[in-house]
């Protein structure tokens, strides 16, 4: 590719999916440029690596580019897209560019409705501990690496495979993981769940004859597609028929202790440095791959025991002063689907037994809130106190019956929690100051702008003091 393409431009370079690819390409020696609507830590990092960053979208930004990379979130009338089309500069979908990177190495693609980022991070960490030095492209910041992407010297590239727009069908990895299959992003599949499951089957058909599909048999929808997978299958999970499974699971001090049972191998005692049964499952996927690739048991144990997590995935901010003179434990999480939220809440209950759980939640997308409305009511009713914001639209038109206020009214009618509704994320710190008290566990949650709240909370409390 390099003899033809020397300069690659990214429209929306600050996004999690785009920035990782841009960083790997920059480290491979390509000239990288990009634009976004605002600066953030990611754009600053890319600039330090030599990328040319423009704030705002303008036709002039693509000057000199041999290819322009876009995601499905970029509109066709974007001025940079229009300029590329006018100049006959190739416009490349993000997943197609990721597929090009995978052609340079042996790809390990992590798919599933939930858990992709954490599982990708665990796989990358375990392979790194085993000396395989993988390249990785992750949808969140791997805390130990301080980045969401890295160019390694080894044979493997580990990356997330995105089913939300069916773009994972562009990838041709040698190992695939399917963590679970759930109803999300259903607009892509015509609101037909059978079409979604068929897409995952087609994803496995991208594997070569020597490849393998590593699948979580605890998920009933994954279990249903196994008979239709024609390539070798490795089953992992907590189920008795899992080939890589966890037994004797014990949650202690925010960690998960368990024994790994693998066919033809001695039992392996593991301590995972993060809470939650769902993370045990995610770790089992990494263990299955690492075992297949010859990583030692010692390296597996070390990587999982020292795993520092991923940004915004049950990310701990430590103790924050509460308005009553005490302090509460602050956690931030990206969860935005009821299934993910339930797993995070269960993990918090297990990690902090007996403590009051306060959730500040920003719903993400009106269509998701509409499609999962009753499930949101059910999961949000399981916390002890709730601050709820208006929906983060993500470019969608408002749906009055699926607004934050409508969700708040439904929760109040259900009678299990009395939500404090705030119109904007900017109001969350004030609301939490009134709700949170000494000894609480406070979780800020959502895929939108609420991710900026935790860093403001300490400053907010100090200003109020």
Swiss-Prot record:
Q: What is the lineage of its organism?
A: Bacteria, Pseudomonadati, Pseudomonadota, Betaproteobacteria, Burkholderiales
Q: Which InterPro entries match?
A: Mur-like_cat_sf, Mur_ligase_C, Mur_ligase_C_dom_sf, Mur_ligase_cen, Mur_ligase_N, MurCDEF_pg_biosynth, UDP-N-AcMur_Ala_ligase_MurC
Task: Give its localization.
Answer: Cytoplasm
Protein name per Swiss-Prot or TrEMBL: UDP-N-acetylmuramate--L-alanine ligase
Q: Which family does it belong to?
A: Belongs to the MurCDEF family.
Q: Which PANTHER family match?
A: UDP-N-ACETYLMURAMATE--L-ALANINE LIGASE (PTHR43445:SF3), UDP-N-ACETYLMURAMATE--L-ALANINE LIGASE-RELATED (PTHR43445)
GO BP annotations, alphabetical order? cell division; cell wall organization; peptidoglycan biosynthetic process; regulation of cell shape
Indicate the secretion signal residues: none
Task: Tell me the function of this protein.
Answer: Cell wall formation.
Enumerate the catalysed reactions. UDP-N-acetyl-alpha-D-muramate + L-alanine + ATP = UDP-N-acetyl-alpha-D-muramoyl-L-alanine + ADP + phosphate + H(+)
The reply on keyword Nucleotide-binding is: yes
Pathway in which this enzyme or protein is active:
Cell wall biogenesis; peptidoglycan biosynthesis
Q: Does the keyword Cell wall biogenesis/degradation apply?
A: yes
One GO cellular component this record assigns the protein to is: cytoplasm
User: Which enzyme type, at the first EC level?
Assistant: ligase
Gene Ontology terms, MF aspect: ATP binding; UDP-N-acetylmuramate-L-alanine ligase activity
Per UniProt, which keywords does this protein have? Answer: ATP-binding, Cell cycle, Cell division, Cell shape, Cell wall biogenesis/degradation, Cytoplasm, Ligase, Nucleotide-binding, Peptidoglycan synthesis
Q: Which organism is it from?
A: Burkholderia cenocepacia (strain ATCC BAA-245 / DSM 16553 / LMG 16656 / NCTC 13227 / J2315 / CF5610) (Burkholderia cepacia (strain J2315))
> Mostly located where?
cytoplasm
Q: Which Pfam families match?
A: Mur_ligase, Mur_ligase_C, Mur_ligase_M
Residues annotated for ATP binding in this entry: 112-118
- Enzyme Commission number, as recorded: 6.3.2.8
